[in-house]
Design a protein with these regions (language model features):
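Thiamine diphosphate
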Residues: 1-167, 171, 174-327
Length: 327
C-alpha cells in the first residue's frame, strides 16, 4: 500500500472522482496552471483541461455562487477557498443559499458541492492566513462539516463529500499537508461522513480532537503513557453532524474528557462536545470536562514566539491530560 502525505491524498481523491464522474469540476484561485498555492491541484489542469479546472478571480463569493448554480444544474463542483480566512465574503452564499436550498424547496433541489478550505495556524501566516472558522458553519443545519486528520481519511472523506447530494465544507489542516503521512489504498474507497474514529484505545482520559490537533493528541498520549496514564484518543472527523454516540461511549469508559482545538475557546466547537457530555454522560464524569483551545485574541500572531504561545502543541495537550488524570 503506497504512503503519501495529506495533500497528496486530497489531490488523488479529486483526480479519481474527476476520472469517475465527468460532472466533477474544480474552481478556485490559482487552481489551474499553478496547481494551487499548496499544490493540491497540480497536474489536474493538464489532465482535464480548462473547462474542468477553472481559475477564478479573487472573489470567494463568486467562487461559491458559481458552484451553487452549477450544482443546481446537476454538476458536482469542488470549490477551493485558498485559505479558510477568505471564506467570509462567501458566507451569505453558503449559509443562506447552499445550506437551505434543499429545505426551502421541500427536497426538490439539492446542492451537491464541496467547499475545500485549508485552515489553521502554525505556518507563520499571521492573522489572515491562520484562522480556524469551523464553528461558524457547524451552527448551520443543511451543511456537513468535515475535517480529516490522516491521508487515509482525507482521500476517503473527500470522495464521500464529492458524492454527497448536499453541500459539504471540507476543512483541511494545512500545517499537516506535508507533515502528516500514512498509507492510502490505491483502490476506490470512501470513508462515510458522520462517524468519529477511536484511533487510540485507553481507560483513564478521553481526548477529543480533529485535524492537526488529533495528530498532536496522539503524540501527547504516547508521551504520558510512559507515566502510566492510559489515554483514549477520538478523532471526531465529522463536526456536523455530530457523532454523539462515540463521544458518550468513550467518556462513559474513562470518566474524564479533554476537548482540543486550535480555534478560539469561547464559542468554539469544543463547547458542543462538552455540552454533549454534560447532557448525556454527566453521572459518568469523575472530573469536569476540560477544553484546551486557542486563546480569545483576534488572530494568530505573526511573531513566531507569540505564534507558539497561541498554538496548541503536544506538550500543552500532555500537560492538560496530566491535570485531568490527577482528579
Amino acid at each position: 500500500m503506497p504512503e503519501m502525505n495529506l495533500v497528496e491524498a486530497v489531490r488523488q481523491a479529486m483526480d479519481e472522482e474527476m476520472g469517475r464522474d465527468e460532472r466533477v469540476f474544480i474552481v478556485g484561485e490559482d487552481v489551474g496552471k499553478r496547481g494551487g498555492v499548496f499544490r493540491a491541484t497540480v497536474g489536474l489542469y493538464d489532465k482535464y483541461g480548462s473547462e474542468r479546472v477553472i481559475d477564478s478571480p479573487l472573489a470567494e463569493l463568486s467562487i461559491v455562487g458559481v458552484g451553487i448554480g452549477a450544482a443546481l444544474y446537476g454538476m458536482r463542483p469542488v470549490c477551493e477557498i485558498q485559505f479558510s480566512d477568505f471564506i467570509y465574503p462567501a458566507f451569505n452564499q453558503i449559509v443562506s443559499e447552499a445550506a437551505k436550498m434543499c429545505y426551502r424547496s421541500n427536497g426538490e433541489w439539492t446542492v451537491p458541492m464541496v467547499i475545500r478550505a485549508p485552515y489553521g495556524g502554525g505556518i507563520g501566516g499571521g492573522l489572515y492566513h491562520s484562522q480556524s472558522p469551523e464553528a461558524y458553519f457547524t451552527h448551520t443545519p443543511g451543511l456537513k462539516v468535515v475535517v480529516p486528520s490522516s491521508p487515509y481519511d482525507a482521500k476517503g472523506l473527500l470522495k464521500a463529500a464529492i458524492r454527497d447530494p448536499n453541500p459539504v465544507i471540507f476543512f483541511e489542516p494545512k500545517k499537516g499537508y506535508r507533515l502528516i503521512r500514512g498509507e492510502v489504498p490505491e483502490d476506490d474507497y470512501i470513508v462515510p461522513i458522520g462517524p468519529a474514529n477511536v484511533t487510540r484505545s485507553g481507560t483513564d482520559v478521553s481526548v477529543f480532537a480533529y485535524g492537526m490537533m488529533h495528530f498532536y493528541a496522539l503524540q501527547a498520549a504516547e508521551k504520558v503513557a510512559a507515566e502510566g496514564i492510559d489515554v483514549e484518543v477520538v478523532d471526531l472527523r465529522t463536526l456536523y453532524p455530530v457523532d454523539r454516540q462515540t463521544i458518550l461511549q468513550s467518556v462513559r469508559k474513562t470518566g474524564k474528557a479533554l476537548v482540543v482545538h486550535e480555534a478560539n475557546l469561547t464559542g468554539g466547537y469544543g463547547a458542543e462536545v462538552a455540552a454533549t457530555i454534560a447532557e448525556g454522560a454527566f453521572t459518568d464524569l469523575d472530573a469536569p470536562v476540560r477544553r484546551l483551545c486557542g486563546p480569545d485574541v483576534p488572530g494568530v500572531p505573526f511573531s513566531h514566539p507569540l505564534q507558539d504561545w497561541f498554538m496548541i502543541n503536544p506538550d500543552k495537550i500532555a500537560a492538560a491530560i496530566r491535570e485531568l488524570a490527577r482528579w
